[in-house]
Amino acid sequence: MFTTEYDVIVVGAGHAGAEAAAAAANMGAKTLLITMNLQHIAQMSCNPAVGGIAKGQIVREIDAMGGYMGIITDKTAIQFKMLNQSKGPAMWSPRAQSDRMRFSEAWRLQLESLPTLDFFQGMVNDLLIEKHKVVGVRTSLGISIKAKSVVLTNGTFLNGVMHIGLKQFGGGRAGEPAAHGLTECLVQQGFEAGRMKTGTPPRVDARSLDFSKMIPQPGDEHPQKFSFSAVTQPLQVQKDCYMTYTSERVHNILRTGFDRSPMFQGIIHGVGPRYCPSIEDKINRFADKDRHQIFVEPEGWHTIEMYVNGFSTSLPEEVQYAALSQVAGFEKVKFLRPGYAIEYDYFPPTQLKHTLETKLIEHLYFAGQINGTTGYEEAAAQGLMAGINAVLKIREREPLILKRDQAYIGVLIDDLITKGTEEPYRMFTSRAEYRTLLRQDNADSRLTPIGYEIGTVSEERYRAWEAKEQRVDDFITYIKELSVTPEEVNPILEKYDSSPMKQGDKLQKVLTRPSVTLSDFEQLPKVSHYIAEHDLSQEEKTCAEVAIKYAGYIEKEKNNADKLNRLESVRIPENFDYDKIVSLSFEGREKLKKIRPITLSQASRISGVSPADISVLVIYMGR
């Protein structure tokens, strides 16, 4: 049936698998995407939204490197918001509500347009391994398929078990079976496996809700978009979300089900996401709070289905219904399906290299929830990098490892490989020590040249980026050289209670004042004429403004990153013998032997490795 050998086989077609397959195919590799249901490619199993704090930056980075998540989100969005705009630009995070069904359909059509990508529906339950190297996969039907590299992106399907109250049943998500055999195969090869848990809220009928009792949550007045490319445009029409609250009455009803909660009764052993707790966990942990927010999100343009964000639960369905019907606006609620929790296997990511290749089996890569992460965006980022590195290894090219000062993707992977995770990992801006460098507005400046060099970014896309960079640079130069008078500027400064100018100065200097923005000066003819003449987009104006206004902070962070990169450049041999350095602490030695860091910088971030241990290594490596 399969007589030829593929370059790359991707197992699983969720957000990680879709990006992995697309990246490999765009690099010209003969790729096969295997999934249990071809109708559910890139399914939004949980909330119908992409982006958010730190996650939006990741989506922009994926897009900058030629991935598709940003484009698909733009094409299927029903609402867009730029979060945290009251804070500095390092915190600005794009987020979009998506049409769930259209999102999956758009992904499938995008993948089907790639000529070197094949598809097959089936369950992979075994790997073909020869001399510690993967050479293919075997399906549950006994079909063997050969490949030079394999990327596993199994999501929540590995031995998945779903829980609603004291009922439990096998499955990877609602209506789909679990995947069996692969965990056992990997454990037999020496991998360590663990269990994690996640959950999802009920879906309800919009026609049964009273939105007049809720608080509308509209999108931005002037929505932006995720993709840097010209193939998508900002939304012209948007759909509202809504906000309401639980109450003490709701909490009391939920408490009546605690004796049948699989979480509280010890039936669920997997660790759940700390930053996305179930509603029962919230009212148990925060008993002093008399209400919690609930966001009611439409699942698409033309569906009655609504997602009840903030009400994830695995309590019995009758308790879910009784409690939710006491929420303002939900008095006559009709359920489409109850919420549930799901437990699944994962593999601690310290078993991987920074390329996402496993340390035990060559040419085998893991990406997504199999590595202990949570979130579509985190999964997609890993899929992109695994797909890229799988192809680079086949071609005997240098691997692509993004550093912590280059991308949130670099922070994500470094955290996983260096620190591991014992609970579902999600990205936050606080995890990135160089977040002023890793802004959403400059993701293309940071990563598009890299994508072009490795083959995931097209020539057309790269040339468009070059032209944009030139326009931004020219505008920055213009602002730096443009003189303004007190008569032009003081009326603007007065609005912000900023001290008036006494003599003429450069616009650049005025723009660095707090509260003052570039849009304030667009009323000046010499600024507005330049913008109109060069047809500058809002994004280009923002890039220029941020570069000028925060130049000092950006320069300081670059200097700090340069210092770290000196340690990053000191490589540690792959088979380095830590036992011969007697000065290392016992814990430090054990952690170094387990993680096997590739640089001194990575070694310094391992929990349990002390500054004294690093000093010893610095001296030893300097010999």
Q: Each PLM stretch: what is its role?
A:
Residues 2-16:
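Beta1/beta-strand and adjacent pyrophosphate-binding region of the FAD-binding site
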Residues 128-144:
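Conserved beta-strand-loop-beta-strand element in the redox core of flavoprotein oxidoreductases
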Residues 431, 437, 448-615, 619-623:
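Extended, charge-enriched "interface" segments that sit outside catalytic cores
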Residues 307-373, 401-414, 537-591, 596:
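A glycine-rich dinucleotide-binding beta-alpha-beta segment and adjacent secondary-structure elements
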Residues 4-6, 140-149:
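Core beta-strand elements of the Rossmann-like FAD/NAD(P) dinucleotide-binding domain
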Residues 37, 55, 183-321, 329, ...:
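An anion/pyrophosphate-binding glycine-rich loop and adjacent beta-alpha core
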Residues 22-126, 141, 153-173, 177-183, ...:
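Conserved N-terminal/central alpha/beta ligand/cofactor-binding core
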Residues 11, 144-155:
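Short hydrophobic core segments
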